[in-house]
């Protein structure tokens, strides 16, 4: 691959600060399922001495060890630390830092607290309900016990959310773990437990069954989405506060995934906002680098998260579990520029994925300069439309609305760089703080968002559909202005260039 000269490595424009990988215990995985067997093969044997030596040579500095409450306390009041003791010692002996991927939202069989319960089938999941106050008591107790045992040996803590992968949101039908829920599916009707129902009854007289059947009025539909997304965000922040109290010296992270937001049970920007109200010492990681195998579309999700991170004040990171992303040269170029364009501070990749890459791609992640993007254009994330779409098809698994947004935003990225903001971010002052002069609406603007744009228009801000921007250059070159330099990516040649501002 042709590479332009990297000329700036100042205190401001540093390469990616941290490179992480992870380990999943074999005893957690249901290898009778093909995806489970793949996870076991790729992730359960990566902390043996030879593999740790490989990762250290590739620039990895931290190994995240998965710790699941389901396995840690199978007998009430009796913690089994044997496996984690062994794994921590292995990572330390390999000269890498120890991180924890804390899945304390998956209870052991004896636990009698509330879990998510779907309304459509009146069936529980095996994931703690964030509406149940006892869920925070669990976090307090298990984080406390873990910190007491390992202390400063733990350098990094990946804070739990409420979804299957420890992300914010609702269950999503994961089947490849031994603790996976027998009943699980993607929908927004996971508000059927008694605490969620009681919380909803305090703000609405409309039965939840009416809402998830798509029969509620517009105001109630929007209220319902705010109801569950707000709880998801606040739960993450409350758990983060507990983890910080127990591990005050540590670095922290939280994963955000799934292409859709409200259909998945949360709002990315709101999660970031609530976390930053606790502390900005956290890296929020988008979990699908290069997921569309094309920079213009894949970067939409990364920039959505990065925009909120820049605005609310925390660091941005990315991760992937795709074996080919950094192995195939063309995909590597697209994924690499996604990291550059979004000033990625922390990168995560699995051992097997890094191993499949050539030597150049293994090391290049730590070579790119990192500097925050600077932009005066913002694309509206159609959060109101996504809410209404989610409620209209509450028990559907389709993400067509999200796909339409990604397609349109991806096409517009060929013409201009941009931030991505939603109605809440505008209300919080995003456009003014980030120096936005032009807002691009790729869909009709709903009245709720139009109301928040009134001040922007009054200050002379321009709102357009994007057609007034110059057409894409030929040949296509993506351009990002950073605080310290300008970066460009030419997909036809694979060249990533850096220029002085």
Predicted regions and their residues:
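Bacterial N-terminal signal peptides
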Residues: 1-10
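The substrate-binding groove and active-site-proximal loops of carbohydrate-active enzymes
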Residues: 34-44, 67-81, 121-140, 217-234, ...
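Short, acidic/polar
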Residues: 42-56, 139-143, 264-275, 328-335, ...
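Aromatic-lined substrate-binding rim segments of carbohydrate-active enzymes
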Residues: 51-57, 64-121, 239-244
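Polysaccharide-binding and catalytic clefts of secreted carbohydrate-active enzymes
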Residues: 121-291, 295-298
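Carbohydrate-binding surfaces of carbohydrate-active enzymes
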Residues: 280-501
